Amino acid sequence: MTTIRVKENEPFDVALRRFKRTIEKLGLLTELRAREFYEKPTAERKRKKAAAVKRHYKRVRSMQLPKKLY
């Protein structure tokens, strides 16, 4: 459970922003969304493999020299 201590005379907005930042750093929202519905192990493997292929092609594309535009 994530907790933050609200300092004296600290506005609510600032405390809420700090809380959201800590939640984002821990990755709790992404994990919560992933666990919201059951995903079959085969579907999970397929999704992760597709993401890895996409990352690979993105890395290859960024390493290539740009085409000449003349």
From Swiss-Prot:
User: Which family, according to UniProt?
Assistant: Belongs to the bacterial ribosomal protein bS21 family.
Name of the gene encoding the protein in the UniProt record: rpsU
Gene3D superfamilies in the record, alphabetically? Ribosomal protein S8
Q: What is this protein called?
A: Small ribosomal subunit protein bS21
Q: Name one GO molecular function term.
A: structural constituent of ribosome
What InterPro entries does its record include?
Ribosomal_bS21, Ribosomal_bS21_CS, Ribosomal_bS21_sf
Q: Which UniProt keywords apply?
A: Ribonucleoprotein, Ribosomal protein
Q: One Pfam family for this entry, by name?
A: Ribosomal_S21
Which domain of life does the protein's organism represent? Bacteria
Cite the HAMAP family for this sequence.
Ribosomal_bS21
Any one GO cellular component localisation term in the record: ribosome
Q: Which organism is it from?
A: Leptothrix cholodnii (strain ATCC 51168 / LMG 8142 / SP-6)
